[in-house]
Structure formats: structure tokens, C-alpha cells
């Protein structure tokens, strides 16, 4: 049967088109995501695809065989920052590999990155996958190793959480925690955006990128899109009482269409305020809040740099266990196109 490649604008494509793409993603998830996870519902994927940020471009492509999508590619590009970088993906249905479909569907993805002036390109590949060899042949480097870890929420040691709170209240007497729920109150908006820049101190290993800045306008767009994606987003922020300065925070996102799941996002403390137990205090307080307000949550997933020993230590103490090791491969776009002949 003949095939064709078409772009897909997920913000406007017919629902029937997105259902066909979703069916391929279900196959992809079963192959690449943790074994036994419930499938992502189409309704969740639909709202995620529909609601893109104003500061991002995500061109996608589908290789069709009749009414079925058998391969896909896409590329994420920030429109405000890190304008040299592009982050892409290619997936071919297992039953259709070995026919150059991957190369075919990758070509328009690379074209988009090139047209947008990107010089560096990255892929994320699960450790041990055969695609790692292809990345090597393309001249890419393993730039960043990430650990995806999971906490079985019902098995969390609540006495340990209480202990972390107690210890922090004794050690960090000059600080208090402030609970916030998206959208962030106007009075905290600029200080909170400034606080997020502390994430620029997190390990990047050999991944090449610039520091990122989030403006209040960007943050408000994130909040609007999170709500459209049916996500509750919660924060605890550590505040220095004497100065009122915000010095640390932790963030959790809860997809309402997947009520068993919580995503642990950023947790960071200003370097000038570390070694007082603020990180553990923030995470323990959030866990206690989730137990009270979100009783359906059974699993909390998070991503960390493999080299981020302090945060991994906290997570291990809480009971997080690695479920995936993912390597980000990065290279020169022109070089990898030449070596892959695509």
C-alpha cells in the first residue's frame, strides 16, 4: 500500500486525525514507557496537543498508510530562548520498520529545524535502545543522563515526612512555607518568576543550552494552558521571613484526567539558603498536602539529572525508585543530516 507524509498541526487538526496519531502513540508508549502503566487516555492527549504555549513551536509529521499513522516525527523549538537548539523525536510502528520510513519521516522534521535557524539537535533515547548506535553514527554525543523515578504513594513513610517537617522547623527558624495553587497571586508573580531561575543551577552535564528566564507574561500563558490541559498545579514556596524573599520551591502537577498520577516538577533552593533542610521540608509538606487533597493519587513520577546527587538522595529517602534511564544525545544538525543522508 502506498504511503504519504503530511504535517499535523495538533492545535487545529481534525479530531479524527489526532485519534489516528494517538493510536500510534499507544503502541509507542507500550514499547518505551514503564511496563504496566495504564494507557494515556485520548482525552488527555487531545488537550495536551491542542494547547501549545505562545513561546513554543512543535511541528509534527505523520506517515500514513491508508487511514493509519505508521510513523511520526516532531521537533520542539523555543521561540524566545535557546534559539540554536531543537529537540526532536522519530517513531516507527514495529511492524513497519526496515523500510526507511524513519528516514523519510525525519526529513521534514530536520527541514523545519534548519529553516528555523537551529544549529544543534537533540534526541532522548532510553538507555540500551538500538537507536543509541544510530546517534553515535550521526556524530551525536551523550550529553545528559536523566533518571525517571516513581514513588508508590500509598507506601510513603509518613512518619519520615513528619520528621522532615519537624527538623526543618527547628533548623530553618528564619523561614516559612507558603502554599500556592495555580494561578499564582499577583503579589507573588514577579518574585516567583525570579525564583524559577534557580533551576539554572541544576546540573546540565554536557548538554549545551543557555540559562532560561520566565517572565510574568510567559508564566500566565503557562497557567492558562495548564488549566486547558485539565491540570491542577500546586506549589510550596520557602520564604525568608525577615526579608520576604522567596528562596525555594517545589511544584507538582496533577492531571485531572489521570487521577492516579502526579508529576513532581521542579524542586530548587537558592544556593545561599541551602543545607538547612528546606528541600526536604518543601517535599514533605507537598506530600502531606497531596495525601489530604488528592486521595486518588497512587504514583508520583519525576525526572532528575543522573548527576544531581542531592536531589536524588532526597528522592531515594522518600522511596522513589528508577523506572527509566534516558540519555539526551545532542549534536550538530548539519553533521547529523550529512551522516544520516537525510
For every predicted segment, state its role.
Residues 4-9, 103-187, 326-331:
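Acyl-donor-binding surface of acyltransferase catalytic domains
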Residues 72, 77-90, 97, 255-265, ...:
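A conserved beta-turn-beta hairpin within the catalytic core of GNAT-like acetyltransferases
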Residues 1-51, 170-217, 341-342:
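Short amphipathic alpha-helix that is part of the acyltransferase structural core
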Residues 138-157, 234, 288-342:
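Active-site/acyl-donor-binding loops of N-acyltransferases
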Residues 58-62, 68-77, 87, 235-237, ...:
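Conserved beta-strand in the GNAT
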Residues 97, 122-132, 270-274, 300-312, ...:
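Conserved beta-strand-loop-alpha-helix junction that forms the acyl-donor binding cleft
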Residues 92, 98-111, 137, 269, ...:
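Conserved acetyl-CoA-binding loop-helix of GNAT-fold acetyltransferases
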Residues 85, 113-126, 290-303:
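Conserved GNAT acetyl-CoA-binding A-motif
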Amino acid at each position: 500500500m502506498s504511503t504519504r507524509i503530511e504535517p499535523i498541526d495538533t492545535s487545529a487538526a481534525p479530531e479524527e486525525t489526532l485519534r489516528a496519531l494517538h493510536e500510534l502513540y499507544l503502541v509507542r508508549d507500550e514499547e518505551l514507557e514503564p511496563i504496566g502503566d495504564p494507557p494515556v487516555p485520548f482525552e488527555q492527549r487531545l488537550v495536551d496537543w491542542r494547547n501549545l504555549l505562545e513561546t513554543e513551536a512543535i511541528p509534527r509529521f505523520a506517515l500514513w498508510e491508508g487511514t493509519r499513522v505508521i510513523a511520526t516525527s516532531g521537533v520542539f523549538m523555543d521561540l524566545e530562548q535557546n534559539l540554536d537548539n531543537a529537540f526532536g523525536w522519530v517513531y516507527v510502528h514495529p511492524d513497519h520498520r526496515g523500510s526507511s520510513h524513519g528516514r523519510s519521516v525525519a526529513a521534514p522534521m530536520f527541514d523545519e529545524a534548519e529553516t528555523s535557524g537551529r544549529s544543534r539537535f537533540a534526541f532522548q533515547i532510553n538507555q540500551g535502545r538500538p537507536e543509541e548506535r544510530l546517534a553515535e553514527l550521526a556524530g551525536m554525543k551523550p550529553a545528559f543522563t536523566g533518571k525517571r523515578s516513581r514513588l508508590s504513594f500509598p507506601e510513603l513513610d509518613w512518619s519520615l515526612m513528619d520528621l522532615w517537617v519537624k527538623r526543618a522547623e527547628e533548623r530553618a527558624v528564619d523561614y516559612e512555607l507558603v502554599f500556592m495553587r495555580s494561578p499564582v497571586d499577583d503579589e507573588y508573580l514577579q518574585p516567583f518568576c525570579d525564583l524559577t531561575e534557580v533551576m539554572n543551577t541544576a546540573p546540565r552535564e554536557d548538554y549545551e543550552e543557555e540559562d532560561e528566564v520566565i517572565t510574568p507574561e510567559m508564566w500566565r500563558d503557562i497557567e492558562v494552558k495548564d488549566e486547558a490541559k485539565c491540570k491542577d498545579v500546586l506549589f510550596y514556596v520557602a520564604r525568608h521571613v525577615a526579608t520576604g524573599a522567596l528562596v525555594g520551591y517545589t511544584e507538582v502537577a496533577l492531571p485531572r484526567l489521570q487521577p492516579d498520577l502526579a508529576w513532581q516538577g521542579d524542586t530548587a533552593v537558592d544556593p545561599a539558603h541551602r543545607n538547612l533542610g528546606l528541600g526536604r521540608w518543601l517535599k514533605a509538606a507537598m506530600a502531606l498536602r497531596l495525601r489530604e487533597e488528592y486521595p486518588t493519587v497512587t504514583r508520583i513520577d519525576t525526572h532528575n539529572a543522573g548527576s544531581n546527587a542531592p536531589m536524588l538522595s532526597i528522592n531515594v529517602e522518600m522511596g522513589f525508585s528508577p523506572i527509566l534511564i534516558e540519555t539526551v544525545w545532542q549534536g550538530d544538525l548539519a553533521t547529523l543530516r550529512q551522516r544520516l543522508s537525510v
